[in-house]
Amino acid sequence: AMLEQLHVDVLDLGIVRDDPAALEAALRDAVARDADAVITSGGVSVGEADFTRDVMARLGEVTFASLALRPGRPLAVGTLARGDGAPGHALFFGLPGNPVASAVTFDAIVRAALLTLAGACVPPPAMYTAYTTQALKKRAGRTEYLRGIATRAADGRWHVAPAGSQSSASLSGLAAANCFIVLGHDAAAVDAGAPVDILPFGSPI
């Protein structure tokens, strides 16, 4: 659905089992079909069944494999060679398997890359200032995207509260939210009533 909002042509190659050979075959198939970008979900962490980064390294180049981002730390970004001596390459984005982490990394990284690839002029994130109605826990050293519900008060100021569960595996909070609460890399815990940045859903990145 997030890809369709960008009006790109989507080629769904289905579900690939946790097997290096099957994954390699699927990625080779994708680039053979002249895909400009290949996006996968899951298999990018360091578990026994996580093969994406190794296969990606064999078929192309891994630019980076993790981010100081929550949710969304495991993320593989790089390129896949066309193979058989064909020129050029396809961009590759290996997103986390947890659905919320996948949505966050798509919004934070993939959306802008695909729009740029399509030749669009990509504006900076449309951030707004809101005042949190609750204290927010945060550890400095990583950027955090909390799912939030923003409302506008009579005085014109935005107020925001966390939307349900903030687990990266829980879709309920994401479904209830209308924005991300973006807490910067160096920020620590936030007191109730403090200003924070929010990124409304549907804002261009």
Positions of predicted regions on the chain:
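Phosphate-binding glycine-rich loops and their immediate beta-loop-alpha structural context
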Residues: 1-40
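Glycine-rich beta-strand-to-loop/alpha-helix junction loops that act as flexible
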Residues: 9, 35, 40-52, 62, ...
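Active-site-adjacent beta-strand anchor residues
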Residues: 13-16, 42, 95, 183
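Glycine-/small-residue-rich active-site loops that bind phosphorylated ligands and cofactors
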Residues: 15-18, 44-47, 101-102, 188
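Short catalytic-site patches enriched in acidic/histidine residues
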Residues: 16-28, 46-67, 74
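Flexible glycine/proline-rich
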Residues: 55-205
